[in-house]
Amino acid sequence: MFSTLSPSAIDDILRHAVHFGQGTTAIAPSPVTFISTTTQQSLGATYPGVFNPTTPTFNHYQHQALPVTMHTSTSSAHHTTTGHGRGRRKNSTINLVCVVCGDQAFGKHYGVNACNGCKGFFRRSVWHNRQYLCRFEGRCAIAKEHRNVCRACRLKQCFVAGMNPRAVQSERVEREQNGSPNQIEEDDYKDLSSPDTCSVEIQTDVDEQKPSSNNSAPLPSMELEMAKLSEQIVEMHRAVCSYVDPVTKRENFDMKMETETTKIAFMNAFYNPEMIGPRTPLDITGRRVATVKDVMDEWKRNFVLFSDWLRALPEYNQMSIEDQIVLAKNRYGTFHWWMCANWTVQAGCEGVCYSNGAYFPKQPEAQCIPDVKGSSGRMYDSLSIPIKELNLDETEIVLMLAVIIFSDEITELADLTPAGKEHVRMVGNRFVRMLHHHVNSKEYGEAMENGDDTQNSSESQAAVRIAKMMILLSATTNLVYLTSDNIQLMEVLHVVPSEYLCHEVQFIQNSYETP
């Protein structure tokens, strides 16, 4: 568990990154290989199925994150041209990052911020319909220093980042009409001559590099890549929700809490969630009305789930420790309400369903704690009922949770560093694209079954559905402010027994305060 790890081991885990030096081999290792053996054993014992390096979910999903926050080298800052014209001076106040490899970008190419190297690589791959094979099962990390190591994973990353192959085809038609079908810009091969990239051995096998024909296989579909990533984050979600501490560990924690009350700093609690509470099995039944103890136990269990969920997400681990804490402090409340709202739909109870078999009723006379602001009724009406009407599937629920975590409200995340703000914005947009592809595919299938084979109709249905889901985002945020008011009023009016105020309520209140 994290409490038994040294500070250096924790930094090792949270700051893991893949770095290649000059003359290194072509194998892109797992980030787990940079963690000490002792640390791996501790993580394997504490989080089997999530942090275990042998777990398919960890290995597979861990390598899908884009290194969008990597710093570029000094040499890349001296380029003064763009992909749209020669001799154009770069605005020194703009620091765009290529969403594929993390190098410096000079503008948007095919729909995303991309460097000239990735722009040319993507265009050549689409024009010539090139097929690549990865020797390492598609698990290579793509970064500026070694982006040529694996063309297969680099092309896949281009699709995942949102590059549009239709824009490439349109450009080719335009060039052919202008009488220069084979014209190639010099920046197409700029990345091949860069000292930062030429020292790395190319390990990718090329299946097909001939011009495309009617019989050639199609390029990997963006929709297929998005669907694959969606499946992987759902697997991660299931693994985190299914983890349970041993019974002896839970009993020892209960005995300890009976004799100790202490104020725990948010940062310590987040990186050591076992200090807050044990990982009990999630009991989503709502079979009994909640007591005061049930309410406080729910906050603790949900916080442990929140900590496990965020720290299992590669996109979150790419942030600095400072930015991680800022984001976590501002997202605990939204995470809690989104999970409870979906549990309420699953259990079918009229109130706020908890993870311990209890529910907090929306009727005032049945409440163990006065709901001064009516947050339980607000959650039921503004979240649970719309979720039930939309009939969200598991993938939509998980992707919406990721969108909620990485929503970039300026006022809430003002304390993030500039790099952190850009990372949150880019990752949030990527999760929105994943949600759009999933919803569009789902709605299109239903339209086909109903005899409506028009793509425009499907996209229209998907847009309406996503718009309704985005409304739920604002409803979740509103509930956070109501909850904060409730906690402050409970403490002032002394409506909660003092033994709970010493630890749980104080900690909950601290989670809404800025660093």
Swiss-Prot record:
PROSITE patterns: NR_LBD (PS51843), NUCLEAR_REC_DBD_1 (PS00031), NUCLEAR_REC_DBD_2 (PS51030)
Residue ranges of the region described as AF-2: 498-509
GO cellular component, one term: nucleus
Keywords, alphabetical: DNA-binding, Metal-binding, Nucleus, Receptor, Transcription, Transcription regulation, Zinc, Zinc-finger
Metal-binding as UniProt keyword: yes
One Pfam family it belongs to: zf-C4
Cross-referenced InterPro entries: C.elegans_NHRs (IPR052499), HNF4-like_DBD (IPR049636), NHR-like_dom_sf (IPR035500), Nucl_hrmn_rcpt_lig-bd (IPR000536), Nuclear_hrmn_rcpt (IPR001723), Znf_hrmn_rcpt (IPR001628), Znf_NHR/GATA (IPR013088)
Tissue: Widely expressed at a low level in many tissues including the pharynx, sensory neurons, intestine, spermatheca, hypodermis, and excretory cell.
Subcellular location(s) of the protein: Nucleus
GO terms for MF: DNA-binding transcription factor activity; RNA polymerase II cis-regulatory region sequence-specific DNA binding; zinc ion binding
Tagged with keyword Ligase: no
Zinc finger region(s), NR C4-type: 98-118, 134-153
Mutant lacking the gene: phenotype: RNAi-mediated knockdown suppresses the longevity caused by an eat-2 mutant background.
Stretch list, region Disordered: 169-195
Positions of the DNA-binding region: 95-170
Highest taxon in the source lineage: Eukaryota
Residue ranges constituting the NR LBD domain according to the UniProt record: 225-509
GO BP annotations listed: autophagy; lipid metabolic process; regulation of DNA-templated transcription; response to starvation; triglyceride metabolic process
Cross-referenced SMART domains: HOLI (SM00430), ZnF_C4 (SM00399)
Chain's role: Orphan nuclear hormone receptor. Required for metabolic and physiologic responses associated with dietary-restriction-induced longevity. Modulates triglyceride and lipid metabolism and autophagy, associated with dietary-restriction, probably acting via regulation of transcription of target genes.
Stated family: Belongs to the nuclear hormone receptor family.
Protein name per UniProt: Nuclear hormone receptor family member nhr-62
